[in-house]
């Protein structure tokens, strides 16, 4: 019986130690969420300005550009998956990987060949475990995204997109990431990045008003050549920031759940230990009383 008490005591200590770790990780994630939200808010004006500029050029000009023109036939499509570098974040990575699998199934049903670009070690591990190939990978920056990484991804995607499919290029590009809705809610989202669909930033004209006339210097094609890569990079960076904030929120939620479960384990094992101690004391009393009765009857 004493051994059983020691087992319960050890389990209580183990649960308490685990709770200290998960509680610390919960607090760290909470502070990182605030920083991630601040970065999202700080990048929003730049993203809106770039979107308005691209919208103006694409809407008020009649120039066909490779990044905005729909191909006659889509043979190959790229999927960029934004997962995490670390675990202990609940269903954060699994949800975005599941969404990407559903997207891939849809694209394959349309007769398209899939090329994967992976961001985050969890996505890389997922593909390695299933022995599936990927075009390129980026790791080490999911928790604190850097614009240099977004630029690297954007450059690789644009280069792949302008290359003909017959030479290893792609006809369209999709990104899959977790959008940060709130601390309690993060939703996996799919966005078609290329060919460009500029639907933001174009204000509806007032009835009877004359549409603005734009003059572009240099030529419209040159303006698009300069603006569109910047637009792609800003969209990718925004996806990385959304994903980072979602990751911290998911980890905070997972660690809070782990801390609550540790509390429940401590309560359960404490009750079991008390019951075991009570049983041991009762048994000892019974043995003493039995021994006393035996001595009394022998006299």
From Swiss-Prot:
It is a peripheral membrane protein. GO terms for molecular function: ATP binding; proton-transporting ATP synthase activity, rotational mechanism. Keywords: ATP synthesis, Cell membrane, CF(1), Hydrogen ion transport, Ion transport, Membrane, Transport. GO terms for biological process: proton motive force-driven plasma membrane ATP synthesis. It holds the Pfam family ATP-synt. SUPFAM superfamilies: ATP synthase (F1-ATPase), gamma subunit. It is found in: Cell membrane. The keyword Cell membrane applies. Transmembrane segments: none annotated. GO terms for cellular component: plasma membrane; proton-transporting ATP synthase complex. Produces ATP from ADP in the presence of a proton gradient across the membrane. The gamma chain is believed to be important in regulating ATPase activity and the flow of protons through the CF(0) complex. F-type ATPases have 2 components, CF(1) - the catalytic core - and CF(0) - the membrane proton channel. CF(1) has five subunits: alpha(3), beta(3), gamma(1), delta(1), epsilon(1). CF(0) has three main subunits: a, b and c. Belongs to the ATPase gamma chain family. PANTHER family: ATP SYNTHASE GAMMA CHAIN, ATP SYNTHASE SUBUNIT GAMMA, MITOCHONDRIAL. This is ATP synthase gamma chain. It comes from Clavibacter sepedonicus.
């Amino acid at each position: 019986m004493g051994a059983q008490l020691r087992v319960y005591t050890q389990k209580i200590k183990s649960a308490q130690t685990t709770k200290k770790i998960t509680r610390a990780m919960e607090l760290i994630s909470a502070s990182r969420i605030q920083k991630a939200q601040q970065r999202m808010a700080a990048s929003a004006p730049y993203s809106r300005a770039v979107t308005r500029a691209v919208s103006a050029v694409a809407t008020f000009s009649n120039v066909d550009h490779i990044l905005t023109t729909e191909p006659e036939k889509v043979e190959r499509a790229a999927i960029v998956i934004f997962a995490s570098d670390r675990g202990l974040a609940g269903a954060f990575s699994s949800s975005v990987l599941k969404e990407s699998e559903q997207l891939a199934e849809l694209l394959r049903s349309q007769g398209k060949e899939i090329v994967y670009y992976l961001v985050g070690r969890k996505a890389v591990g997922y593909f390695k475990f299933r022995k599936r190939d990927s075009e390129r990978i980026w790791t080490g920056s999911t928790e604190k995204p850097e614009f240099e990484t977004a630029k690297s991804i954007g450059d690789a995607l644009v280069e792949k997109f302008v290359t003909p499919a017959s030479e290893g290029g792609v006809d369209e590009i999709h990104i899959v990431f977790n959008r940060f809705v709130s601390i309690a809610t993060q939703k996996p989202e799919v966005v078609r990045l290329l060919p460009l669909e500029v639907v933001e930033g174009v204000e509806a004209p007032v009835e009877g008003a004359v549409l603005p006339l734009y003059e572009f210097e240099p030529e419209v094609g040159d303006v698009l050549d300069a603006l569109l890569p910047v637009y792609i990079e800003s969209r990718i960076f925004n996806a990385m920031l959304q994903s980072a904030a979602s990751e911290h929120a998911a980890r905070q939620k997972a660690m809070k759940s782990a801390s609550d479960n540790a509390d429940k384990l401590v309560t359960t094992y404490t009750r079991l230990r008390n019951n075991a101690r009570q049983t041991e004391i009762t048994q000892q009393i019974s043995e003493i009383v039995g021994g006393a009765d035996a001595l009394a009857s022998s006299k």
